């Protein structure tokens, strides 16, 4: 005879709506091989860690897409797929009294900023946009090195002045021809040989 199990008297638990939590873990950045993180919910008075939570990304393909790992101490928004408490999903991050925006608000409300934070350092990389009419600006900062790879042609057009300053050495290699057209004056100062 087959064993009989009594019918379940209680429905499986469900979590309704999003919650916020604090990212926890070892060091400054803690994730597994799938980019999952650990969080602690505000109601968790014992300070227990959650299971690893998947992190929603703006793009996620096979070997391509975007990867932004929330760091320890950040406040994140957690949803539960189909309300299942065993399926947490981090859907975003929020600023709070502990973690402020990268520029003053509302004074900088016309700026869109993408700023990172150097791991175990004091610097940052940044791409920012100023959208105030008459002051529009695209700003890029590399805390250390900047590398650009172009697979075919590269074109740059400047509508007014252009300045470049190199604090150390500069080298240039041209595989074939070089053409330079100057509409007015050209001056060069060489201090050494």
For the regions a protein language model found, what residue spans apply to each?
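Short aromatic-glycine motifs in intrinsically disordered, low-complexity regions
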Residues: 5-15
